[in-house]
Amino acid sequence: RRRLRPVKGRIAVTGFRVGELLEQPNLGSVSCEAGLNGVVGKGLIDARVDGSVSQLEFNGYDYDSLCFGGRLTEKTFNGHVRADDPALRFDFQGEGGFNPERPHYDFDLDLIHADLARMHLNRRDSVSVLSALVEARASGRTLDDLNGKVTVGDVVYRYNADTLRTTRLTLDGQNSAGSKYLSLQSEFADATFRSRTDYKTVFEYLRSSLEKYIPLLYDERKARKRAAGAVSVVDDYSVLSVDVKHFTPVADAVADGLQIADGSQLRLLF
């Protein structure tokens, strides 16, 4: 039987330069406090945790009013995270599994307000505000073994020229070592991808093909360098299908002048 020991305590730090410690230039200082109350043993922890972040500098913006709480074990965290910052307000509730072989995610996120321009995440538009509801039920370490579904609903994106809205967007993944499947369904377009090749190889193949057939989109020297180590999909095939419904609102939000006709279809077999 494992020997368990009670543990209880709190810690507080002010102006800790965590970015320097982790060698992450976009991450600055942090001020926070946290507490833990539970039991620990050899390879085991079961405790209630809570805390708050009064200051966190990231990407040139100072966040505040973040708090969290829940139950922490050696393999899971089940609880909530809330933000009430002027640029970021959200309510996260759910569970995350830390199993290194197959982590899982089961959560609901109410993204009440995210000012992407103020947080320096969108430098093109002076107005860039997003809100949405997100449900995720998935597992996997990477895209290659990702299985589950992510649903995004009640999306409102306000930018300089207009406001983009959608009621539902669904991403479904069914992936294993020998089979890849991704499906995206929305009011704007539906897309399906099937393959037996890992995604990294597929992405490299698509990029090298674009550099070959549309060289003006890429730096010539970099393209030649990558072409020397270009990959190919051997004894396999991949299929990408895209059916455009009404994509104009998305195109306007992504890039000025981008136009994709409603009803367009794309079928790629490679």
List the predicted regions and their residue ranges.
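Interface amphipathic segments
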Residues: R1-L133, S139-F270
